[in-house]
Amino acid sequence: MAGEVSAATGRFSLERLGLPGLALAAALLLLALCLLVRRTRRPGEPPLIKGWLPYLGVVLNLRKDPLRFMKTLQKQHGDTFTVLLGGKYITFILDPFQYQLVIKNHKQLSFRVFSNKLLEKAFSISQLQKNHDMNDELHLCYQFLQGKSLDILLESMMQNLKQVFEPQLLKTTSWDTAELYPFCSSIIFEITFTTIYGKVIVCDNNKFISELRDDFLKFDDKFAYLVSNIPIELLGNVKSIREKIIKCFSSEKLAKMQGWSEVFQSRQDVLEKYYVHEDLEIGAHHLGFLWASVANTIPTMFWAMYYLLRHPEAMAAVRDEIDRLLQSTGQKKGSGFPIHLTREQLDSLICLESSIFEALRLSSYSTTIRFVEEDLTLSSETGDYCVRKGDLVAIFPPVLHGDPEIFEAPEEFRYDRFIEDGKKKTTFFKRGKKLKCYLMPFGTGTSKCPGRFFALMEIKQLLVILLTYFDLEIIDDKPIGLNYSRLLFGIQYPDSDVLFRYKVKS
């Protein structure tokens, strides 16, 4: 009854407001936005670029061509400047020798505050902002993504790859045509999900995975909007899709999954310690972990395959390297799936790794972001800069990745860019000085992706199988650009797709 009265009152008030009242409300809202951007540069602060749009600031310029726009600002204002972007003031530090200013100031520049706010907006996880102990315990679970635990994951992953490839793809003896992005997303999603979460044992697992993947991709498509300040109610059916995915991780559904990984089991144990049994926020945590596991791996796999398909010399070098490794370990490609490579053997494939790193260099827009907890002065060799409490400070690696002083012809794909004298190349220079950071697709410092080893091994394993067992040819041999829809978050989508064809080698 109270709800009906409230709703009726709301309608009555809106009607009474009329057009003049609505115009006044709109004017007041515009005034509030203008007051928000009335900020002026204080002495000691970096140059301030607010753009001409209230609240949005420079977002349209940045979305159009991020790298060119940032390089233009760098040329005009230097390596450090502050921009208004979607209601937030972000100070960008572009000099790679000043990155430590962001990385080392843990107390004043917080990743946790920023990430917890992001988790609440994107996945509806609220408790992490209040419970630091749970945050710390969940962080400890990442130990199961490295060392011996990673070896166990890789073994499980290989078994899952066999079950995906043997009954379906290995029967493709004549040419089959597919779009590259759906091909990559289908395989990566299934392999990742079954390796981490296990398989559903009481229903059609393939149908479950297919439906979950489709819902996940719809959710991920709106991720950039979710983490902005746009209300989720304005994003179509994203809220209902998110709720549907979260319910896939209810205690009832989890009981039907067999083959949990150590990292998933440990996270579930921590969550059950801090939440009541049926709390849907447990499922929200699992959705967040699923997003972190596949949202960047899928486009990385796409770009790695795309560049190998378009560059025959790269494909030939990687295939030759894989063949030599198989011969040296006494393994042969036969019927079924006899190939088995350890983590150390996968790490020895330097042409393959260099090709993946080069694809990441060209497609990664992963931005290291910190929340300023108190007014702070950043002191560097080139000067001191003041940043304000409540602002954000960021490192924008695409400027580093596209620097011709560091990478010759940075717009080109060169599969051997990270190889020197037959070994992994880890030494790069700028202004005659060695760089500590030269490739940053996984972030840096406290925000460095804890699942990077798992993701790289997954892509390496999958590429080894595809290049060993299949003939692969690109049909649409055309240049593909970046979509920029996930501007500051991870690996960018392609702005279009390409057709390729594949068949089992005779």
Swiss-Prot record:
Any Gene Ontology CC annotation: endoplasmic reticulum membrane
Location of the protein in the cell: Endoplasmic reticulum membrane; Microsome membrane
InterPro entries, A to Z: CYP450_sterol_14alpha_dmase, Cyt_P450, Cyt_P450_CYP7A1-type, Cyt_P450_E_grp-IV, Cyt_P450_sf
Main localization of the protein described in the UniProt heading: endoplasmic reticulum
Tissue-level expression: Widely expressed. Expressed in brain, testis, ovary, prostate, liver, colon, kidney, small intestine, thymus and spleen.
Binding site for heme: C449
EC number: 1.14.14.26, 1.14.14.29
Membrane topology according to the record: Multi-pass membrane protein
Reactions catalysed, as given in the entry: 25-hydroxycholesterol + reduced [NADPH--hemoprotein reductase] + O2 = 7alpha,25-dihydroxycholesterol + oxidized [NADPH--hemoprotein reductase] + H2O + H(+); (25R)-cholest-5-ene-3beta,26-diol + reduced [NADPH--hemoprotein reductase] + O2 = (25R)-cholest-5-en-3beta,7alpha,26-triol + oxidized [NADPH--hemoprotein reductase] + H2O + H(+); (24S)-hydroxycholesterol + reduced [NADPH--hemoprotein reductase] + O2 = (24S)-7alpha-dihydroxycholesterol + oxidized [NADPH--hemoprotein reductase] + H2O + H(+); (24S)-25-epoxycholesterol + reduced [NADPH--hemoprotein reductase] + O2 = (24S,25)-epoxy-7alpha-hydroxycholesterol + oxidized [NADPH--hemoprotein reductase] + H2O + H(+)
Enzyme class (EC, first level): oxidoreductase
Membrane spanning stretches: 17-37, 289-309
Keyword Amino-acid biosynthesis: no
Family statement: Belongs to the cytochrome P450 family.
Known function: A cytochrome P450 monooxygenase involved in the metabolism of endogenous oxysterols and steroid hormones, including neurosteroids. Mechanistically, uses molecular oxygen inserting one oxygen atom into a substrate, and reducing the second into a water molecule, with two electrons provided by NADPH via cytochrome P450 reductase (CPR; NADPH-ferrihemoprotein reductase). Catalyzes the hydroxylation of carbon hydrogen bonds of steroids with a preference for 7-alpha position. Usually metabolizes steroids carrying a hydroxy group at position 3, functioning as a 3-hydroxy steroid 7-alpha hydroxylase.
Disorder this protein is connected to according to its UniProt record: Spastic paraplegia 5A, autosomal recessive: A form of spastic paraplegia, a neurodegenerative disorder characterized by a slow, gradual, progressive weakness and spasticity of the lower limbs. Rate of progression and the severity of symptoms are quite variable. Initial symptoms may include difficulty with balance, weakness and stiffness in the legs, muscle spasms, and dragging the toes when walking. In some forms of the disorder, bladder symptoms (such as incontinence) may appear, or the weakness and stiffness may spread to other parts of the body.
Pathway(s) it belongs to: Lipid metabolism; bile acid biosynthesis; Steroid hormone biosynthesis
Documented activity regulation: Inhibited by drugs voriconazole and metyrapone.
Cofactor(s) needed by this chain: heme
Taxonomy of the source species: Eukaryota, Metazoa, Chordata, Craniata, Vertebrata
GO molecular function, one term: oxysterol 7-alpha-hydroxylase activity
Keyword Transmembrane helix on entry: yes
Keywords: Cholesterol metabolism, Disease variant, Endoplasmic reticulum, Heme, Hereditary spastic paraplegia, Intrahepatic cholestasis, Iron, Lipid biosynthesis, Lipid metabolism, Membrane, Metal-binding, Microsome, Monooxygenase, Neurodegeneration, Oxidoreductase, Steroid biosynthesis, Steroid metabolism, Sterol metabolism, Transmembrane, Transmembrane helix
Listed name of the protein: Cytochrome P450 7B1
